[in-house]
Amino acid sequence: MKRINILNEDTANKIAAGEVVERPASVVKELIENSIDANAKNIIIEIEEGGISLIRIIDDGDGIYKDDIAKAFLPHATSKIQESEDIYNIHTLGFRGEALPSIASVGKVNLKSKQDEEAFGYEISIEGGKASEVTECGINKGTILEVQDLFFNVPARKKFLKSVSKESSLINDIVTRLSLANPKISFKLYNNHKKVLHTFGNGDLKDVIRTIYGKSITDNILYFSDSSDLITVYGYVGTEEIARGSRNNQSIFVNRRYIKNRALAIAVEQAFKSFSTVNKFPFFILFIEVYPEYVDVNIHPTKAEIKFNDERMIFKKIFGAVHTALKNEVFETFAIKEEENTKKEPLPTFEEITFKIKEEEEKVKFASSAAKTLISQGKDLKANNESSFKSVYDPSLNNINKTIVEESTDYNKENEEPISIPVDLKPNSYIENLVDDYSDNAEDEIKSNSEPIENVITENKYENIKPNPIAKFPPITIIGQYNKTYILGEYDGTLYMIDQHAAHEKILFEKYLKEIEEGTIIIQPLIVPSIIDLSIDDYSYFEENKDIFREAGFLLEEFGGSSLSLKEVPYFLGRLNPKNLFLDILDNLKNLGNGKTSEVKHNAIATKACKAAIKGNDKLEMNEMIKLIEDLRYIDDPFHCPHGRPVIIKFTSIDIDKKFKRII
């Protein structure tokens, strides 16, 4: 057996340098962060041959005390903290005291520094870890640090460096990130004596963005912000016009520290996808300001990753801020006059609408708390419908006027019978039977009657209007239907095109999402429980979030090992595979880190709303188009479907005149 040896200082420093000094860009990052911590207002970075031959950092910061210049290159020597408790209250970018000794062990270093009250500056040189005497020198206030011939004594590390152009590009990238994080500091970057970057340090973040990314990017970004007692998030997110196929144009800063965090990036991306149809990554610059004690920056050698005390809370704050900014931008495009928005709507009249509903596998979905009771009792609903309904009916559920007639609208394309839009089902309507959606293979499954039904429903449109409704777009006049897919309308010289499927889909989506948020979830017992086998990791995540599943309407019991027995599931939007629904929500929780019940169900609701909505190629009558558009005007976001596709587009008279060359 080999004996244990104590490594000498030179070997230990080279090992430590392997973690901190990965490449020239790592050196540049550490030295610039030291300049920022020294309150520099102007920082000049000069590199040659990709930083391998020379890295020079010049700043006008506070400088270093004469007696501390030699100490600065000792391992774990730092001015940032004094005791272990300070690690959890970090206000500076550096704190470990590892960067300078690590750099000095693998490069030829020269440091000059002067404080404002000193008459002279002081200089020290270190080569391969061996330091010279500290001597006087002439220098302005601040610090100049040069690193030459990087990795001259570690040829194995030097061999793994990329090309000069690639190393230069990596240095340029880190300097631009630090410039974004510090708009009050002027940065100048010179590559082989050629200036490649110059920010002006005027404190305007948008000026820095324009300098780095150009005018086209700056003209297509939106500001977002949100704050609470514990956290503030703000920044800029790009429109889909500047989305890219990679995440290179994404920057995240926590307390001005540049980090990489996939979960936080996904928060922005998920909000972006709600308003975009392109399969690309959004441009964004995200700033998070949080109390230092709520983050741990001491978990990564280069401090590129940090740990949050409550990442889910931060995720939701970011998602909400970005989503609101993008939504407001769309709303402004369709903004209506104040008088149009506040004027009193005329009282609607009752109108008789006949809906012919042909029989499919499921006739009518009965959405009330009565569903669970009636299923468990297994009574004959046809014979006892009215009495059973009255015995379990809860008036607090708004007279059960939220029933959805799903996938029951079939129309004869040869005769072009009108497709119907789902309306409220009155409590005294006859219900032939209630089908158990989740027990296709169960012997006790209730069989559906095959007789078609025809309902004449009296609809009070006023019941659906909220108090003081706010319309999101003007009251357009319906012109007609184009290609049995798009509804055409006009208002004040502007032509509107509405995707009828996307419009109806979004109406259904928001309706069901609201019901879930209000807690009126209907529970569907399974006749035959479903056994779900989970991995150890998935089971642990379920244990951590079991309350979320219970609130979402799942009844799950342990079934030995990491298996679960699924006995009850939420009932919404018709037929769903209960096992797949559970696993989808579990994956959503793992990927997004979001614990809000309605949000983890987002994808499932969107999918079912899509299937339940009227389709393209469905002919609509004029009164149906009017009703659909009127309902669309008053939902929260009528401009995008749940999948991010646009619902409405508009053309001004100028746009159309340009197409016909009437104006140039």
Curated annotation (Swiss-Prot):
Q: Which domain of life is it from?
A: Bacteria
Q: Name one GO biological process term.
A: mismatch repair
GO terms for cellular component: mismatch repair complex
Q: Which SMART domains match?
A: DNA_mis_repair (SM01340), MutL_C (SM00853)
Q: Which GO terms describe its molecular function?
A: ATP binding; ATP hydrolysis activity; ATP-dependent DNA damage sensor activity; mismatched DNA binding
Any Pfam family from its record, for instance, is MutL_C
Keywords, sorted A to Z: DNA damage, DNA repair
Question: Which family would the database say this protein is a member of?
Answer: Belongs to the DNA mismatch repair MutL/HexB family.
What job does this protein perform? This protein is involved in the repair of mismatches in DNA. It is required for dam-dependent methyl-directed DNA mismatch repair. May act as a 'molecular matchmaker', a protein that promotes the formation of a stable complex between two or more DNA-binding proteins in an ATP-dependent manner without itself being part of a final effector complex.
- Fetch the PANTHER family from UniProt: DNA MISMATCH REPAIR PROTEIN MLH, PMS, MUTL (PTHR10073), DNA MISMATCH REPAIR PROTEIN MLH1 (PTHR10073:SF12)
Q: What is the official name of this protein in its record?
A: DNA mismatch repair protein MutL
Q: What is the species of this protein?
A: Clostridium beijerinckii (strain ATCC 51743 / NCIMB 8052) (Clostridium acetobutylicum)
Q: Which gene encodes it?
A: mutL
